[in-house]
């Protein structure tokens, strides 16, 4: 049985947030991340030619790469990115029309929110997950844990300032997955001709996630 988009996101646990200064740079970053084991990528609409980047990635990698779109703020953008290959749509803020359009087209909706009121409003509007952004600017893992205390049913994805050093704390606080930007999407490494830096960081994130899950399973068993 084929995994759903939600199942893949939670199994993988990592959503690299792709920002780049050119389409070529974006494609080079994704190539390096895939070499490091990454299988999920969010292509933000701030990438020049973002729709073409989505189409190119879909054509090159097919089902091997779960594609999402990011920084989507209108229903038309959501529809366009889905047509280009996005299976999930991420916003930096709450736009009910984006949620409605995304869900109507059968895809996963991940709006952004920060305060408890914003988060529950987005969830009640039909969000599949809520992106907590910018999470690290307001307390990081402790803030995420505080949000989940009154709303344990919510599925939250912290984004903004997530690093290898802070990632495990977010997972322990209850994150369903991690949205990771510049700590993984290292544009300087690509410009310097050093894609291996991204390969290594990708592997480090996936290894950390694997170890975290093994530890959690061990705890449950005992």
Label every model-predicted segment.
Residues 1-84, 104, 153, 164-165, ...:
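Conserved N-terminal beta1-alpha1 strand-loop-helix module at the mouth
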Residues 19-22, 47, 67-75, 91-95, ...:
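Glycine-rich beta-to-alpha transition loops that act as phosphate-gripper elements at the mouths
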Residues 88, 92-138:
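Histidine/lysine/aspartate-rich catalytic loop segments that bind and position anionic ligands
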Residues 121, 142-157:
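Shared catalytic-loop signature of beta/alpha-barrel
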Residues 88-98, 131-140, 174-195:
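Glycine-rich phosphate-binding active-site loops on the catalytic face of alpha/beta enzymes
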